[in-house]
Amino acid sequence: MNASWIVANMEWVLIVCGALTATMLFPMIAPRLAFKQMFGEVAEGPLGELLTRNWGQMIFATGLLLIYAAYHEEARLPILVFASFTKLTFAALVLSNGGRYGRKLAMPIAVGDLSMVGLFVWYLLAVS
C-alpha cells in the first residue's frame, strides 16, 4: 500500500482506533475486574483503585481525542504524537516484564497499541 491510502482513510483509522482506545473506560467503572482480566492481578487498596480509575479515564480521554482528530485535521499532529507516546509507553512496560503478562489480556492490548502507532507514524510520514 502506498502513502495515499493512509491519507485517504485516516478519518476511519482514527475513528476505529479511538473507539477501541475508548473501551478502556472499563477500568474506571470496574477497576478490580478490569485489572484482573488484563493483568491477572489487582492493584489493592483505595490507592490502587484510585489510580486504576484515573488510568482508565485518561486512556478513555485519549480515545476521544483520536475520534476528535478524525474530524479536525489541524489537531492531528499533537493528538497523534500524544497517543503514540502513551501507547508506546504501555507496550514497552508490558513487554519489558518478560513473560509475566504474555498470556494475559495486556499482551494483545500492547500489540494492538503498537499496530495503532504504526498506522499513526505511517500517516505522519505521508503528510510530512
Predicted regions and their residues:
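Core segments of alpha-helical transmembrane spans in multipass integral membrane proteins
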Residues: 19-28, 47-70, 84-88
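Membrane-helix boundary connector in multi-pass membrane proteins
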Residues: 74, 91-108, 125-128
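Non-cytosolic membrane-interface motifs at loop->transmembrane helix junctions
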Residues: 42, 78-82, 102-112
